[in-house]
Amino acid sequence: MAREMTILGSAVLTLLLAGYLAQQYLPLPTPKVIGIDLGTTYCSVGVFFPGTGKVKVIPDENGHISIPSMVSFTDNDVYVGYESVELADSNPQNTIYDAKRFIGKIFTPEELEAEIGRYPFKVLNKNGMVEFSVTSNETITVSPEYVGSRLLLKLKEMAEAYLGMPVANAVISVPAEFDLKQRNSTIEAANLAGLKILRVINEPTAAAMAYGLHKADVFHVLVIDLGGGTLDVSLLNKQGGMFLTRAMSGNNKLGGQDFNQRLLQYLYKQIYQTYGFVPSRKEEIHRLRQSVEMVKLNLTLHQSAQLSALLTVEEQDRKEPHSSDTELPKDKLSSADDHRVNSGFGRGLSDKKSGESQVLFETEISRKLFDTLNEDLFQKILVPIQQVLKEGHLEKTEIDEVVLVGGSTRIPRIRQVIQEFFGKDPNTSVDPDLAVVTGVAIQAGIDGGSWPLQVSALEIPNKHLQKTNFN
């Protein structure tokens, strides 16, 4: 008996040693399942590497780790992501964005009428569902699922180029409030892109996984997701590795675009007061918007940022500079106050070829000014937070962990507003832009059987869950 036990022990040790040596010296297996964050404004793809337990968010051919959720249709081709952004000004009626807002969703006529007016492309009502009308060589209609499939195909190709092998399986995230039809429509979009979806995971749950909360000893988790166009607040209850979304609230018309718009309106007024005209050329408006975005990003790290823009003055429209209290004329507001139209890429008037001169507009924007322009919007973030606490029958002191998701949560004043409300710092240990895709990639690794083994997140369906929107 002792001899048999010795042999058995030696065999176990041999297996353990072989496993250790294999883990140390053999090439790591390539991930076979990708994780996808199909966002409203940006989307991204990541993989979980067996052995190391690391997540890699995969860049595109130009090094971007996320791509704009935009698709442009032309006579020659269909362009996706940053290539689509370049066409947004010259081809706005055929450049589709915000498709995620419409995928699998049934609208009332009143709801759809309100949505139609927000976009430069044609939004059609097909029995309460949305289709988009685009004109390339001919006028065609495309569904939100098809637009989503083009984005997913691009992400799939990025993953295949990085991994050096075909990819067929994926895990994908969706908003927690998506119903079964919206989830199935998202799966349909993935199928059109040649992907089999192994699992659909809620975005707040994915974010919590990225922060490691599926393995942590916490119970009440509040996820604040503030991106380019929307705010979503979710209250999660966690027991072991199981997550229950207990309450949701948000604002579908609050995000980084709105903060940019406040600064852009301020700049238009400054230009009018200084030079007596308002920029109307679409390429100049586009450059101004890009400059505003860069200033906003710089202000997350610095107390001030420099903005400069080369502007064309059409002499026949130029007036004497105005005093600082002069209001921008109503007829000049069309381009400056084009609120949230064309996803922040601007629209202009026809170009003129004669009687022109150029001026270099330069100004310094302080963080204090940016915060002052947006303070009322920053305070609106607290409204859905208070709502989910009310629906969850919790005091703010009972929240164990506050998790930040989305690029707009980088803004220092927003973090301060949240910190002051809860009386403690939010968890900022994960890049908020990549929190969801990181969590989805971890789940993809789990579903792909990667090692070291991770604790999977089990989501408990909540059939009574409804999202309260403050738009």
Swiss-Prot record:
Its main location: other. It holds the Pfam family HSP70. One of its GO terms (cellular component) is endoplasmic reticulum. Keywords: ATP-binding, Endoplasmic reticulum, Microsome, Nucleotide-binding, Signal. GO terms for molecular function: ATP binding; ATP-dependent protein folding chaperone. SUPFAM superfamilies: Actin-like ATPase domain (SSF53067). It is found in: Microsome; Endoplasmic reticulum. Residues 1-22 form the signal peptide. Residues 315-341 have a biased composition (Basic and acidic residues). Residues 314-352 are annotated as: Disordered. Has peptide-independent ATPase activity. Belongs to the heat shock protein 70 family. Binds UBQLN2. PANTHER family: HEAT SHOCK PROTEIN 70KDA. This is Heat shock 70 kDa protein 13. The gene is HSPA13.
